[in-house]
Amino acid sequence: MMGASTGQGYEIARKSREIVRELISEDISSLGPAEVAIVERIVHSTADPEYARITEFSQGFVDEALRSLRSSGGILTDIEMVRAGISHPSRCYIREPAVRELAEKRDITRAAASMEYAASQGFRGIVVIGNAPTALMKVIELTLEGLMDARAVIGVPVGFVGAAESKEALRGTEIPHMITRGPKGGTPVAVAAANALIALSKDKEV
């Protein structure tokens, strides 16, 4: 549970999770068990109960994400910090020289360029966006055009410029997804959601 590896650590995590459940029980009453587990982990990781009210899942998101993980689908992130926090082999191309060149040539962000690069490399799997709205918009574009095989998208970029809009754009598609409405989100949320799915895919405690 939450990375606990000792008896004391497990007990702390258990008590914390009990507190989280009391705080958000009304807000998650309509969610399925897997969705509840994901939201609980997000709230636990951020110490912010508001995520229970602003986190949304599209129909079939959890099933598609778990199916991808169990069939050796990849995980792609927008920045290295998100990749570093995920407890599963993941890819982030933002530092690739080819991505830098593409971004400069096209006058787009490196985060967006990294999604184009991933698509050109035949990426298939779950896309995890915790910081860059431009990356999320590019994933939507590539997926709808049939150029990227995004099986499921965790779309939780943070910020006041483009974050809410990019999530609403994702919300309006049929791409399996989860989002946090409004400007809130970020690395801790993205990592918590991804690691919860990974645990669920292995039938482990979230």
Swiss-Prot record:
Pathway: Cofactor biosynthesis; adenosylcobalamin biosynthesis; cob(II)yrinate a,c-diamide from sirohydrochlorin (anaerobic route): step 9/10. The keyword Isomerase applies. GO terms for biological process: cobalamin biosynthetic process. The keyword Isomerase applies. It holds the Pfam family CbiC. One of its GO terms (molecular function) is precorrin-8X methylmutase activity. SUPFAM superfamilies: Precorrin-8X methylmutase CbiC/CobH. Substrate binds at S16, R41. The active site is at H44. Disulfide bonds: none annotated. Keywords: Cobalamin biosynthesis, Isomerase. Its EC number is 5.4.99.60. It catalyses: Co-precorrin-8X = cob(II)yrinate. Homodimer. PANTHER family: COBALT-PRECORRIN-8 METHYLMUTASE. Catalyzes the conversion of cobalt-precorrin-8 to cobyrinate. Belongs to the CobH/CbiC family. This is Cobalt-precorrin-8 methylmutase. It comes from Methanothermobacter thermautotrophicus (strain ATCC 29096 / DSM 1053 / JCM 10044 / NBRC 100330 / Delta H) (Methanobacterium thermoautotrophicum).
